[in-house]
């Protein structure tokens, strides 16, 4: 298998990961994952690689992510990377490890924002009535 393309979604963010044999370089939108600006999110993105340990050493991952905010993009990237590693290595043991650690590594988190409805400022909030 030359390469594998996988996707991950979170809120309105969609990430597409291309996994192929290489030197263990992970890039997100053209920049190395090690240079991702927010440390908490950087650690979150690199979780699948850290869990896979030696199995992911010779794999290059290129992620393109669009939509959403920084946290949604990080979660989408993380899911795409984990799915890509599992699919590229065809390793069920690794998939089970990911699922036990955190199910959202393999399965998309389908929760989205509740849409705004008429008669108020948000999805649930309504304009006040005075009755006087």
Curated annotation (Swiss-Prot):
Keywords: Ribonucleoprotein, Ribosomal protein. One of its GO terms (cellular component) is cytosolic small ribosomal subunit. GO terms for molecular function: RNA binding; structural constituent of ribosome. Gene3D superfamilies: 3.30.230.10. InterPro entries: Ribosomal_Su5_D2-typ_SF, Ribosomal_uS9, Ribosomal_uS9_archaeal, Ribosomal_uS9_CS, Ribsml_uS5_D2-typ_fold_subgr. Disulfide bonds: none annotated. The keyword Ribosomal protein applies. Signal peptide: none annotated. GO terms for biological process: maturation of SSU-rRNA from tricistronic rRNA transcript (SSU-rRNA, 5.8S rRNA, LSU-rRNA); translation. PROSITE patterns: RIBOSOMAL_S9. Belongs to the universal ribosomal protein uS9 family. This is Small ribosomal subunit protein uS9.
């Amino acid at each position: 298998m030359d390469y594998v393309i996988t996707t991950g979604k979170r809120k309105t963010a969609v990430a597409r990961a291309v996994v192929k044999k290489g030197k263990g370089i992970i890039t997100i939108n053209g920049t190395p994952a090690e240079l991702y600006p927010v440390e908490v999110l950087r650690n979150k993105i690199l979780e699948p690689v850290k869990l896979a340990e030696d199995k992911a050493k010779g794999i290059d991952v290129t992620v393109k992510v669009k939509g959403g905010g920084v946290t949604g993009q990080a979660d989408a990237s993380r899911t795409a990377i984990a799915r890509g590693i599992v699919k590229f290595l065809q390793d069920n043991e690794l998939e089970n490890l990911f699922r036990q650690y955190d199910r959202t590594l393999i399965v998309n988190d389908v929760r989205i924002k509740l849409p705004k409805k008429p008669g108020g400022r948000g999805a649930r909030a309504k304009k006040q009535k005075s009755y006087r």
